[in-house]
């Protein structure tokens, strides 16, 4: 993992510096490229020695939902030509960290057993921003195994109010 982070850092820094004028726009296409690059079949295709960098680029550009901006095209070509497609998710993660550091915000992942409607999510986001004393970029991921409640991860901080966590606490108390 440390090696992947070391490989990704110069790409993330260059991307951050090049996109300072439109960080939010860049974040959108970086996230899309990250999602595409996580596909194991795509990585297997890209690792095939009979496949050219141009073919990999055309495939990814075709998968992308919209036309990629010129900066995204150049960035993607560079990553593919240097054989670093597998590092793209880590590049995206480091880019997000730099973007958040500049804006003074953090990413928050809310794990929930059930879908959260937009009104409840907005209220939850406001409460979490007060609790963590900073602006949060909230995303939701469903985890039915939580049974009920939510688990929030902000950086290295975890706020777990799920039923599963409470059951685990009760189990620990009973077996202690």
UniProtKB/Swiss-Prot annotation:
One of its GO terms (cellular component) is plasma membrane. It holds the Pfam family OSCP. The keyword Cell membrane applies. It comes from the Bacteria. It is a peripheral membrane protein. One of its GO terms (molecular function) is proton-transporting ATP synthase activity, rotational mechanism. SUPFAM superfamilies: N-terminal domain of the delta subunit of the F1F0-ATP synthase. Keywords: ATP synthesis, Cell inner membrane, Cell membrane, CF(1), Hydrogen ion transport, Ion transport, Membrane, Transport. Coiled coil: none annotated. Its main location: membrane. The keyword Membrane applies. It is found in: Cell inner membrane. Gene3D superfamilies: N-terminal domain of the delta subunit of the F1F0-ATP synthase (1.10.520.20). Belongs to the ATPase delta chain family. PANTHER family: ATP SYNTHASE DELTA CHAIN. F(1)F(0) ATP synthase produces ATP from ADP in the presence of a proton or sodium gradient. F-type ATPases consist of two structural domains, F(1) containing the extramembraneous catalytic core and F(0) containing the membrane proton channel, linked together by a central stalk and a peripheral stalk. During catalysis, ATP synthesis in the catalytic domain of F(1) is coupled via a rotary mechanism of the central stalk subunits to proton translocation. F-type ATPases have 2 components, F(1) - the catalytic core - and F(0) - the membrane proton channel. F(1) has five subunits: alpha(3), beta(3), gamma(1), delta(1), epsilon(1). F(0) has three main subunits: a(1), b(2) and c(10-14). The alpha and beta chains form an alternating ring which encloses part of the gamma chain. F(1) is attached to F(0) by a central stalk formed by the gamma and epsilon chains, while a peripheral stalk is formed by the delta and b chains. This is ATP synthase subunit delta.
């Amino acid at each position: 993992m440390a090696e992947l982070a070391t490989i990704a850092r110069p790409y993330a820094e260059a991307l951050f510096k090049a996109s300072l004028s439109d960080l939010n726009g860049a974040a959108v296409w970086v996230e899309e490229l990250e999602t595409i690059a996580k596909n194991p079949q795509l990585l297997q295709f890209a690792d095939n020695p009979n496949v050219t960098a141009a073919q990999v680029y055309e495939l990814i550009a075709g998968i992308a939902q919209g036309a990629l901006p010129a900066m995204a095209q150049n960035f993607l070509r560079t990553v593919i030509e240097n054989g670093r497609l597998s590092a793209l998710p880590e590049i995206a993660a480091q880019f997000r960290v730099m973007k958040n550091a500049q804006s003074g915000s953090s990413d928050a992942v809310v794990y929930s057993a059930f879908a959260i409607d937009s009104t409840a999510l907005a209220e939850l986001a406001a409460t979490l921003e007060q609790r963590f004393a900073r602006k949060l970029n909230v995303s939701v991921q469903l985890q039915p195994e939580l049974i009920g409640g939510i688990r929030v991860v902000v950086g290295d901080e975890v706020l777990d109010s799920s039923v599963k966590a409470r059951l685990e606490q009760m189990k620990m108390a009973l077996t202690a």
